[in-house]
């Protein structure tokens, strides 16, 4: 038995080293035939004695499919997005903001790291004692889908870190992608089988990662570049700069993009960006820009983050690809607030790997600015290689007698006159019964940030409105399962589930109901502030505009919007209808209790306090903790600074803990936070 254990360990080590040399270093050290023979030997040993199986065995890269799809997991450390710059001017403006945040008055350059921005899919890899424990997609940044079985098939991701005495945990972040030649082979195979082709490698990669069968993932040969990591705060010899982070990742067995550069200040970074803008088409994978990072990790912590992105990094996106096309039509879309958006429809063109045939024109002013005529040849590009836009017209190619384009005078959905307020650029339909406004309002009411009703998608909403079954939000709650089941593509079970979900949504808190009403200028954050100050719709409707405007973060624009909305008779009837079908439109007991210790009570324990969360709390998810803190009048920040009042630290707290200790910030456990909330 001891001999078999030793032999299995030897084989694992040999095969993993060979795989790393082949897939990561691109320097094979073992013949394929020998690799196959040793692989089969290890496989036979493990089959004969399953106790020899280990998580880092190369035979375990392709496992069984998950029984019931993917489940959501919370990231130990959130995956933030990056702010974008689209030219050197915006890059310079970011650099100036960074210098200001760091209070750098001298002229000494800041060392910056330039890394190619891979056009793939972000992954979060969790290692426990050096062994890959979990892999997840970015998701919304706070949580993502757990796809460990699929990620284990990516040969450039080590199943065991190739370092001695690994930390208790390591979080590695990077980008999964499909190389160009692999993508071409995948599409060729799909074409041969009569399957729809993938539009671009990024879409193919995203679809592959969500395959339920890991064998399909393995066959598509995804690749991976690692670009950052997180270690326990007490780990010795942690990297002190981004350049060393990349070296650490390489030493641990990850593939790191070799096309990177440590630059002494902004000028060097600009040269790096210009070079790769010219050379990117020579690469064997897709890249859509350069990521610029402050090299010093201590200064990164000092710079901190906003709610969405780090201040110490930015993505400089390559100039968009452009292509000419013939303008065929001006379409018009009506949104839930009645805003009319003109859309240019043109002959399909290929841009940044996708076929594009439509682009928003935003408003009537943009149509006039471009001087658009039917049949014009227009130049189309993708801003940030994502959003199509018409950038200019080629008037020299304009057909004789071409008719100028302009917005219609009447709503294309209901025929009402369109109006435009002199104070804004938007043209609007002001008919509250307009089907387009109703559809948009229904979609907003059931959206995730509002009442969060599962099972009510766009096509079903379209049916309900077209058949006259729903004429207001309140009508949703008058639907029964039998009626829903009679509609196209709605089964009895789906109908019953939707009725149950609608009934359950009546219990959503008052601030979600307020947000769901879709009042102009009121987002989720403002709705929370208003709901905390006014515990029901009646008190909000009766409030003086000056009192509303005086609330923190509200102001006269929102106050005026609320006053206009409540003065509209159809909206008054809507509130009455919602109460009639069982919506409270008021704060429940738990909300009132939270508000009594929060912004509405000057004695609230966390009123005006700034807290930072780090690590994994034993009982509360990060989102739950944030909700409790905000309910008690506190603010949750993403980074530690001199303005931080408390750091709430859980298991595996990261660098935020050490920074808080160095600044003298008070450290709380979850239990201490709960005690503070209860005072």
Curated annotation (Swiss-Prot):
Pfam families: BRCT, DNA_ligase_aden, DNA_ligase_OB, DNA_ligase_ZBD, HHH_2, HHH_5, Nlig-Ia. Its cofactor is Mg(2+); Mn(2+). SMART domains: BRCT, LIGANc. One of its GO terms (cellular component) is cytosol. GO terms for biological process: DNA repair; DNA replication. Zn(2+) binds at residues 411, 414, 429, 434. One of its GO terms (molecular function) is metal ion binding. Signal peptide: none annotated. Its EC number is 6.5.1.2. Residues 601-679 form the BRCT domain. It catalyses: NAD(+) + (deoxyribonucleotide)n-3'-hydroxyl + 5'-phospho-(deoxyribonucleotide)m = (deoxyribonucleotide)n+m + AMP + beta-nicotinamide D-nucleotide. It comes from the Bacteria. Keywords: DNA damage, DNA repair, DNA replication, Ligase, Magnesium, Manganese, Metal-binding, NAD, Zinc. The active site is at residue 117. InterPro entries: BRCT_dom, BRCT_dom_sf, DisA/LigA_HHH, DNA_ligase, DNA_ligase_CS, DNAligase_adenylation, DNAligase_N, NA-bd_OB-fold. NAD(+) binds at residues 32-36, 81-82, 115, 138, 175, 293, 317. DNA ligase that catalyzes the formation of phosphodiester linkages between 5'-phosphoryl and 3'-hydroxyl groups in double-stranded DNA using NAD as a coenzyme and as the energy source for the reaction. It is essential for DNA replication and repair of damaged DNA. Belongs to the NAD-dependent DNA ligase family. LigA subfamily. This is DNA ligase.
């Amino acid at each position: 038995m001891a001999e078999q254990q030793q032999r299995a360990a030897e084989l694992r080590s040999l095969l993993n080293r060979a795989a790393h040399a082949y897939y990561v270093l691109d320097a094979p050290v073992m013949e394929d035939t020998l690799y196959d023979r040793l692989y089969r030997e290890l496989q036979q040993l493990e089959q004969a004695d399953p106790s020899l199986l280990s998580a880092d065995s190369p035979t375990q890269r392709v496992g069984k499919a998950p029984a019931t799809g993917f489940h959501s997991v919370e990231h130990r450390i959130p995956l933030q997005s990056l702010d974008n710059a689209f030219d050197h001017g915006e890059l310079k403006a970011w650099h100036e903001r960074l210098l200001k945040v760091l209070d750098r008055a001298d002229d000494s350059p800041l060392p910056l790291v330039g890394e190619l921005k891979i056009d793939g899919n972000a992954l979060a890899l969790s290692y426990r004692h050096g062994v890959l424990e979990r892999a997840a997609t970015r998701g919304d940044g706070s949580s993502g889908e757990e796809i460990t079985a699929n990620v284990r098939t990516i040969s450039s991701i080590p199943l065991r870190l190739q370092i001695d005495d690994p930390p208790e945990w390591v979080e590695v972040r990077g980008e999964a992608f499909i190389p160009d030649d692999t993508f071409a082979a995948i599409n060729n195979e799909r074409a041969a089988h009569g399957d729809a082709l993938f539009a671009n490698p990024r879409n193919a990669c995203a679809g592959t990662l969500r395959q339920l069968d890991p064998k399909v993932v393995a066959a598509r040969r995804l690749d991976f570049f690692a670009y950052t990591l997180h270690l326990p705060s007490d780990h010795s010899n942690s990297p002190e700069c981004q350049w060393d982070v990349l070296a650490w990742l390489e030493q641990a067995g990850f593939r790191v993009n070799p096309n990177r550069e440590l630059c002494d200040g902004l000028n060097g970074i600009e040269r790096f960006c210009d070079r790769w803008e010219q050379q990117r088409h020579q690469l064997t994978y897709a890249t859509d820009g350069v990521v610029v990072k402050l090299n010093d990790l201590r200064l990164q912590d000092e710079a901190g983050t906003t709610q969405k992105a780090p201040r110490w990094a930015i993505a400089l996106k390559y100039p968009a690809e452009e292509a000419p096309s013939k303008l065929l039509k001006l379409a018009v879309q009506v949104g839930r607030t009645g805003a009319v958006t003109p859309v240019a429809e043109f002959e399909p063109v290929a841009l940044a790997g996708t076929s594009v045939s439509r682009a928003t024109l935003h408003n009537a002013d943009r149509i006039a600015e471009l001087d658009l005529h039917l049949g014009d040849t227009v130049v189309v590009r993708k801003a940030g290689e994502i959003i199509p836009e018409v950038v200019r017209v080629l008037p020299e190619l304009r057909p004789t007698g071409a008719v100028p384009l302009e917005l219609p005078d009447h709503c294309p959905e209901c025929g009402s006159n369109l109006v435009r307020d002199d104070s804004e650029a938007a043209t609007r339909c002001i008919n509250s019964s307009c089907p387009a406004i109703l559809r948009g309002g229904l979609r907003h009411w059931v959206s995730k940030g509002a009442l969060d009703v599962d099972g009510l998608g766009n096509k079903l909403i379209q049916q309900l409105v077209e058949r006259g079954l729903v004429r207001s939000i309140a009508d949703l709650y008058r639907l029964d399962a039998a009626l829903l089941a009679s509609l196209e593509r709605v089964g009895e079970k789906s109908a019953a589930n939707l009725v149950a979900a609608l009934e359950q949504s009546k219990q959503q808190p008052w601030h979600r109901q307020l947000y769901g009403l879709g009042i102009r200028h009121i987002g989720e954050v403002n709705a929370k502030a208003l709901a905390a100050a006014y515990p029901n719709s009646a008190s909000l409707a009766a409030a003086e505009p000056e009192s509303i405007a005086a609330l923190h973060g509200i102001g006269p624009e929102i106050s005026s919007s609320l006053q206009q909305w409540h003065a509209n008779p159809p909206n008054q009837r809507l509130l009455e209808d919602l109460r009639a079908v069982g919506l409270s439109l008021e704060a429940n007991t738990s909300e009132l209790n939270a508000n009594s210790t929060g912004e509405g009570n000057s004695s609230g324990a966390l009123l005006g306090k700034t807290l930072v969360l780090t690590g994994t709390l034993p009982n509360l998810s990060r989102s739950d903790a944030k909700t409790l803190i905000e309910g008690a009048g506190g603010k949750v920040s993403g980074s530690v600074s001199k303005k931080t009042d408390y750091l709430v630290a859980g298991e595996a707290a990261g660098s935020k803990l050490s920074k808080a200790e160095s600044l003298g910030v008070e450290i709380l456990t979850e239990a201490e936070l709960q005690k503070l909330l209860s005072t």
